[in-house]
């Protein structure tokens, strides 16, 4: 969960988020090297007293500054495309959960075991036993270390179902069902928010996912 003055990304709690953090660091290192190189070139131009000011063209230099950026872009594109296709790949999920966005709350449907559906509203901020503007009355509970297919839809306007620590951000569009695969590595409680401005109470649409063991998940299903 993000905290005040936090500069880093949230800890990865899913394989997808681990890949996204790796890509972020990979790209950041390339940008750092480019920045250092440009600073060196500008400094050398300033400090060399315009030694080469009469050079009008140089084919070798033109080839170099054309090929090197191409190589850099390819080096950045390969991991990006890998993550892009992994994000769309869904292979034999354990279960399917449907999340429907409303103004201004979420509802969830579990239809694989028995027909379970419930609404998830933000808890009043006056209740000091919960995180302000983040906790809900009914959490989405899933088993850890299992592939879960999420179907995202909207009943009114465009929303966005987003959980940063899991690397999940799916648009919730009326009349359209988007899907993604999600797997959580460890037990815990993970917080998210609607990330699409959807009206007056847009900032009061928290998402809370509780990851637990298979046995606890089955016990929860039986209790409903």
Curated annotation (Swiss-Prot):
It is a multi-pass membrane protein. The keyword Acyltransferase does not apply. InterPro entries: CcO_II, CcO_II-like_C, CcO_II_C, Copper_CuA, Cupredoxin, Cyt_c_oxidase_su2, Cyt_c_oxidase_su2_TM_dom, Cyt_c_oxidase_su2_TM_sf. Residues 1-26, 83-224 are mitochondrial intermembrane. Keywords: Copper, Electron transport, Magnesium, Membrane, Metal-binding, Mitochondrion, Mitochondrion inner membrane, Respiratory chain, Translocase, Transmembrane, Transmembrane helix, Transport. Binds a dinuclear copper A center per subunit. Cu cation A1 binds at residues 159, 194, 198, 205. Residues 49-62 are mitochondrial matrix. It catalyses: 4 Fe(II)-[cytochrome c] + O2 + 8 H(+)(in) = 4 Fe(III)-[cytochrome c] + 2 H2O + 4 H(+)(out). It is found in: Mitochondrion inner membrane. Its EC number is 7.1.1.9. It comes from the Eukaryota. GO terms for biological process: ATP synthesis coupled electron transport. One of its GO terms (molecular function) is cytochrome-c oxidase activity. The chain crosses the membrane at residues 27-48, 63-82. GO terms for cellular component: mitochondrial inner membrane. Mg(2+) binds at residue 196. Its cofactor is Cu cation. Cu cation A2 binds at residues 194, 196, 198, 202. Belongs to the cytochrome c oxidase subunit 2 family. Component of the cytochrome c oxidase (complex IV, CIV), a multisubunit enzyme composed of a catalytic core of 3 subunits and several supernumerary subunits. The complex exists as a monomer or a dimer and forms supercomplexes (SCs) in the inner mitochondrial membrane with ubiquinol-cytochrome c oxidoreductase (cytochrome b-c1 complex, complex III, CIII). Component of the cytochrome c oxidase, the last enzyme in the mitochondrial electron transport chain which drives oxidative phosphorylation. The respiratory chain contains 3 multisubunit complexes succinate dehydrogenase (complex II, CII), ubiquinol-cytochrome c oxidoreductase (cytochrome b-c1 complex, complex III, CIII) and cytochrome c oxidase (complex IV, CIV), that cooperate to transfer electrons derived from NADH and succinate to molecular oxygen, creating an electrochemical gradient over the inner membrane that drives transmembrane transport and the ATP synthase. NCBIfam families: CoxB (TIGR02866). This is Cytochrome c oxidase subunit 2. It comes from Exeristes roborator. The gene is COII.
